[in-house]
Amino acid sequence: MRLILCLPVLVVVLLMVLEGPAPAQGAPAIASTFRNIPNSLKEFGNNLKDAFESIPEATQKLMTSFAEGLKNFRIPMV
């Protein structure tokens, strides 16, 4: 019974393997790629700048919440 159930799966896998690799997608024109590099670098720089500018604020929030947690921390008496 298992053989009857496995045969269709094996046939599908065999057909997929024999089909071969998918054809490559057409590459965009190299000139348009070079034209987009400055914009991509500028966007990356802006994202990096925003990320670094948010570090002090996030650190301050973390330290504040940590200090609040320490204020409320009590060692249980046994």
Curated annotation (Swiss-Prot):
Residues 1-26 form the signal peptide. Keywords: Lipid transport, Secreted, Signal, Transport, VLDL. GO terms for cellular component: high-density lipoprotein particle; very-low-density lipoprotein particle. GO terms for biological process: lipid transport; lipoprotein metabolic process; negative regulation of cholesterol transport; negative regulation of lipid catabolic process; negative regulation of very-low-density lipoprotein particle clearance; triglyceride metabolic process; very-low-density lipoprotein particle clearance. GO terms for molecular function: fatty acid binding; phospholipase inhibitor activity. The keyword Nucleotide-binding does not apply. It comes from the Eukaryota. InterPro entries: ApoC-I (IPR006781). Its main location: secreted. It is found in: Secreted. Disulfide bonds: none annotated. Inhibitor of lipoprotein binding to the low density lipoprotein (LDL) receptor, LDL receptor-related protein, and very low density lipoprotein (VLDL) receptor. Associates with high density lipoproteins (HDL) and the triacylglycerol-rich lipoproteins in the plasma and makes up about 10% of the protein of the VLDL and 2% of that of HDL. Appears to interfere directly with fatty acid uptake and is also the major plasma inhibitor of cholesteryl ester transfer protein (CETP). Binds free fatty acids and reduces their intracellular esterification. Belongs to the apolipoprotein C1 family. This is Apolipoprotein C-I. It comes from Acinonyx jubatus (Cheetah).
